[in-house]
């Protein structure tokens, strides 16, 4: 992105081409009197450019859509209306989108924000959109859909030309063309060498050349069906379709620009805000805690969106045409959007692993609760529960709305614990509809979750937890002798195993803690036990998420290795007012490769040992203080 911004700054004094509509449907304004934005003088296209176009035209004539007028996009970082005017007719384009780089100071430099087509010298039905950086360009291309031909006439450095091709070939349809015009053909210096080198490396790697390819390099090579190097530039023929990854904030404007009001609507939007986080109590590694956990709770703008005419595929894949809607991504505010049910192409594009275009239609209006890891208790608690807040709004808006999810368990129904949790929240099981393959639906209500691992937790999540807890408690009776102190153990040989866990648990047992394994109890029984506890200790992981059901703010003691990155317990504690005391163990770097379920331990899930000799006294002091706080009950 920095390279795009640098190029925009260098072009600061240059005129922009007109924009008939902006990236999100903005309309042009009249040119100001006295503005001087003269375009480059038109010239006859060179033989080199003609050769490139001939290569593309021949390919289009042989394709599956031969005879159809192509949709063409042109990327420019300076005004070249003569080039755009020549490319459109030469390719027989039915639509020409000119993406023109602009500098943010252009208006102050005498160039109007949007100029009429006559002023810029463009002809025909060309539409011009401006961009200042890589993200702008991504959004502009997403706004205008897939293209048969994308012509890159940017005059960036060779490295940036290579990056542009690797990223934005994703917007070209299967069988289409990405054309990079060399700077020399435009009167500039040669600048496609990096593109040729990078594309060739990816292709060679797929055919057994020495050297390791990254995932993105491999995906790039798989998208290039043919690479042709000509005097005037480079032609890449595209293989496969890319789907655009969308983020929450950019989705409504992009959908509105593409579909008008027919895409759907926003049912609710809550403003972004920042709240303090004061969660950590005692720890044996304050430096790591300060580095690992956020000190501010940066809650993004939160929305409940109602989509129309979308396709839903199992494992949280949500598609409209060739757009991957933001509810596809469980970690939707991270730098890169990823879903393991998708084939990654690059930062901006991915592709479903199943056919979403010919999916059958499922009648009805639905509330979306599917998740990527649909049988995992921890993911359900941290990714479905934080979406339940919108159920009341969805039901008020659509009284006949149903739940849409997917499952591979319990004869096509969600796992029993999920059904019980939903019923406790007030969602009857007969309202839950399960899919096992892609379906298209007329209306789908999707809530952005109130919590995201590693990022934020909205305090509003507390009311959802309380409603869920109270619904579960109605299904059980109080214990005659409630256990006020719980230690949550784990099955042996799971990943992140505390190898001296028996010693740790013995220490807590001597202090009056009851050792339990939650999986041996129903979710209703678990809710009751956690509700009655004043202190909960155990190994960091999904079994501790039941602290959501506590009756009041409690003390939580967690043990974990030093590389584990998830922060769910921390965020849950922040919402409910719990105090988290965290003890890090010493990792075993040469440990086993897989756990008892066949999962790779990798770096973040290594086994560890709690160093009792070094940290035992600190733990004892904490337990002494908690006895004073909570008494001996």
Q: Could you say what each language-model-derived stretch is?
A:
Residues 32-65:
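Class I SAM-dependent methyltransferase Rossmann-like catalytic core
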Residues 141-149:
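A short acidic, Gly/Pro-enriched loop at the edge of an enzyme's catalytic core
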Residues 184-198:
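Conserved class I S-adenosyl-L-methionine
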Residues 176-182:
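Conserved beta-strand signature within the Rossmann-like core of class I S-adenosyl-L-methionine
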Residues 158-166:
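A short, conserved alpha-helix within the catalytic core of class I
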Residues 172-173:
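Helix-to-beta-strand junctions that scaffold the AdoMet/dcAdoMet cofactor pocket
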Residues 52-127:
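SAM cofactor-binding core of SAM-dependent methyltransferases
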Residues 79, 201-633:
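The feature primarily captures lumenal catalytic ectodomains
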């Amino acid at each position: 992105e920095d390279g795009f911004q640098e190029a925009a700054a260098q072009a600061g004094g240059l005129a922009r081409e007109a924009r008939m509509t902006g990236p999100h449907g903005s309309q042009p304004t009249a040119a100001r009197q006295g503005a001087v934005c003269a375009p480059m003088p038109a010239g006859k296209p060179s033989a080199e450019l003609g050769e490139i176009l001939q290569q593309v035209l021949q390919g289009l004539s042989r394709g599956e859509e031969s005879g159809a007028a192509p949709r063409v996009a042109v990327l420019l970082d300076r005004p070249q209306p003569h080039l755009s005017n020549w490319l459109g007719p030469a390719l027989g384009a039915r639509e020409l989108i000119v993406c023109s780089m602009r500098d943010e100071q252009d208006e102050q430099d005498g160039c109007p924000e949007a100029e009429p087509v006559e002023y810029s010298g463009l002809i025909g039905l060309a539409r011009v959109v401006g961009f200042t950086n890589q993200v702008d360009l991504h959004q502009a291309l997403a706004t205008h859909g897939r293209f048969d031909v994308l012509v890159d006439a940017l005059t960036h450095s060779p490295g940036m030309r290579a990056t542009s091709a690797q990223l934005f070939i994703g917007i070209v349809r299967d069988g289409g063309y990405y054309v990079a015009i060399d700077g020399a053909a435009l009167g500039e210096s040669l600048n496609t060498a990096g593109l040729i080198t990078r594309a060739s490396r990816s292709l060679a790697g797929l055919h057994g050349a020495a050297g390791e390819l990254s995932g993105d390099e491999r995906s790039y090579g798989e998208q290039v069906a043919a690479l042709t190097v000509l005097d005037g530039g480079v032609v890449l023929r595209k293989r496969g379709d890319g789907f655009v990854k969308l983020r929450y904030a950019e989705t409504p404007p992009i959908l509105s620009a593409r579909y008008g009001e027919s895409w759907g609507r926003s049912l609710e939007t809550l403003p972004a805000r920042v709240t303090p986080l004061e969660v950590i109590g005692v720890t044996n590694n304050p430096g790591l805690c300060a580095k690992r956990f956020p000190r501010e709770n940066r809650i993004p703008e939160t929305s409940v969106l109602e989509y129309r005419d979308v396709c839903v595929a199992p494992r949280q894949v949500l598609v409209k045409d060739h757009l991957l809607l933001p509810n596809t991504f469980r970690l939707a505010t991270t730098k890169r959007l990823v879903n393991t049910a998708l084939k990654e192409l690059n930062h901006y594009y991915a592709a479903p692993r199943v056919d979403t275009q010919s999916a059958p239609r499922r009648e009805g209006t639905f509330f979306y609760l599917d998740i990527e890891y649909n049988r995992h208790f921890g993911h359900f608690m941290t990714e479905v529960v934080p979406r339940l807040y919108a159920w009341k709004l969805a039901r008020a808006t659509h009284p006949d709305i149903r739940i849409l999810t997917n499952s591979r368990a319990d004869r096509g129904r969600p796992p029993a614990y999920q059904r019980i949790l939903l019923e406790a929240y007030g969602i009857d099981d007969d309202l839950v509809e399960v899919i096992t393959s892609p379906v298209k639906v007329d209306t789908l209500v999707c809530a952005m979750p109130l919590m995201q691992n590693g990022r934020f937790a909205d305090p509003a999540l507390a009311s959802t937890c309380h409603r869920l807890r109270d619904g579960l408690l109605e299904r059980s009776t109080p214990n005659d002798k409630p256990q006020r102190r719980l230690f949550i153990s784990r099955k042996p040989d799971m990943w992140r195993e505390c190898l001296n866990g028996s010693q740790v648990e013995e220490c807590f047992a001597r202090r009056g803690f009851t050792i339990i394994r939650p999986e041996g109890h129903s979710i209703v029984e678990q809710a009751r036990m956690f509700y009655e506890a004043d202190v909960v200790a155990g190994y960091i992981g999904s079994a501790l998420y039941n602290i959501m059901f506590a009756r009041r703010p409690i003390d939580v003691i967690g043990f974990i290795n030093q590389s584990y990155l998830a922060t769910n317990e921390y965020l849950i504690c922040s919402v409910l007012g719990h105090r988290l005391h965290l003890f890090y163990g010493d990792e075993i770097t040469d440990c086993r490769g897989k756990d008892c379920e066949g999962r790779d331990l990798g770096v973040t899930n290594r086994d560890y040992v709690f160093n009792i000799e070094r940290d035992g006294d600190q733990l004892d002091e904490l337990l002494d203080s908690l006895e004073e706080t909570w008494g001996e009950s």
